Design a protein with these regions (language model features):
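N-terminal substrate-binding region of glycoside hydrolase catalytic domains
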Residues: 23-100, 106-135, 141, 157, ...
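Active-site cleft segment of glycoside hydrolase catalytic domains centered on the general acid/base Glu
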Residues: 83-88, 113-227, 240-257, 281-294, ...
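Aromatic-rich peripheral "rim/lid" segments of glycoside hydrolase catalytic domains that contact
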Residues: 41-47, 261, 280-296, 300-353
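Boundary at the C-terminal end of the N-terminal hydrophobic targeting segment
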Residues: 19-21
Length: 353
């Protein structure tokens, strides 16, 4: 068993520039960087492990094999954060670096997740038919802006962590399952109208919970919803907070098993579109475990899913500890990558012995 001290020595001796040799397969390593614009506007500067100031996206791309970014987009956000213009600007930066783009439609003016799926203010009081039109027009408007500026997303999410539906209560999955599926279909059709080759993703949380995926996706299929790919969130940290009896290893194993199950049952590819691990600068052993777990997830998602998992995205790796009260980023308080980021590097993605 490799000791913790030897693990750290191996990590610090690793020259990140070696990561520039990309894998030959089509497996994607990605990063959701929705906070990045706001961070840069607030003066946050990023550095590599040697202390050299670097552009954040360039650092992710060249040192850690991050080949794609994921960007959320809100309908009418207060202050303009995460709007279509910010999406376009980040899309241009990614394209200049040869990175691919995933667009994550929240269909809300702010955060949408399993605990909240608020209807945008401008859509309030609309009928189901009108709200489907709203969703369709918003999707087409955002994607057309990208297309007119030469940006082509490879993947588009129609909703964010829609385990319980979206646009509540109109599209709540328990109260109105048919309408939930109708919104998914409206989003799918809108994406295909602008970008026929884009892969449309239905995204759910708790990737380790097979029963959730069976229940939700069966409803989507039953009532005419369509998707090309299933996106999963995988957060051992949050799963263990909610269920202390669980452990990270079993959660990861259950997710890998669920990827195989979902791909077989629904005949589609799968991606882990969100994951993250605790950054605790006072306890480096916590971050070392995060490195091991991220490396394991990437390794097994690529090698042990019958070729059906197409990638892993880290949610806000460039997030400094405590930014927006979040502690699952992978950079330290000085804006430099922690050991967690080494999970992306092929040379360190072998089982520790």
């Amino acid at each position: 068993m490799m000791t913790f001290r030897l693990m750290l020595l191996a990590a610090t001796m690793m020259v990140p520039r070696m990561a520039q040799s990309q894998t030959n397969d089509d497996f994607v390593k990605g990063a959701d960087v929705g906070f990045l614009t706001a961070q840069e506007q607030r003066g946050v500067r990023f550095h590599d492990r040697e202390g050299h100031e670097r552009d954040c996206l360039e650092l992710l791309r060249n040192d850690y094999q991050i080949g794609a970014i994921r960007m959320r987009v809100w309908v009418d956000p207060r202050g303009g954060s995460c709007d279509k213009h910010e999406l376009l600007a980040m899309g241009r930066r990614a394209k200049a670096l040869g990175m691919q783009l995933m667009v994550d439609f929240h269909y809300a003016d702010s955060w949408a997740d399993p605990s909240q799926q608020p209807i945008p203010a401008a859509w309030q009081g609309h009928s189901f038919k009108q709200m489907k039109r709203d969703l369709r027009e918003h999707t087409i408007d955002v994607l057309t802006l990208l297309k007119e500026n030469g940006i082509t997303p490879r993947w588009v999410q129609v909703g964010n962590e829609t385990a319980n539906g979206l646009l509540w209560p109109m599209g709540h999955i328990k109260e109105n399952p048919r309408q939930y599926a109708g919104f998914i279909r409206a989003g799918y059709d809108a994406v295909k109208k602008v970008f026929p080759e884009a892969l449309v993703i239905v995204h759910l949380d708790r990737g380790h919970k097979q029963s959730l995926y069976d229940w939700n996706l069966d409803i989507v299929k039953k009532y005419g919803g369509r998707f090309d790919m299933v996106g999963m969130s995988l957060y051992p940290y949050w799963a263990m907070r909610d269920h202390p009896e669980l452990d990270a290893d079993s959660i990861i194993s259950d997710c890998i098993r669920n990827i195989r199950h979902v791909s077989r049952k629904y005949g589609c590819d799968v991606m882990i579109v969100e994951t993250g691990f605790e950054t605790n600068e006072e306890h480096p052993e916590v971050m070392a475990r995060g490195w091991q777990q991220l490396a394991r997830i990437i390794r097994e998602a690529r090698n042990d899913t019958e070729g059906r998992c197409r990638g892993v995205f880290y949610w806000e790796p460039q997030c400094l500890p405590g930014y927006h009260h979040y502690h699952l980023g992978a950079f330290d308080s000085k804006g430099a990558p922690t050991i967690i980021m080494n999970g992306f590097i092929d040379a360190l993605m072998q089982p520790l012995r």
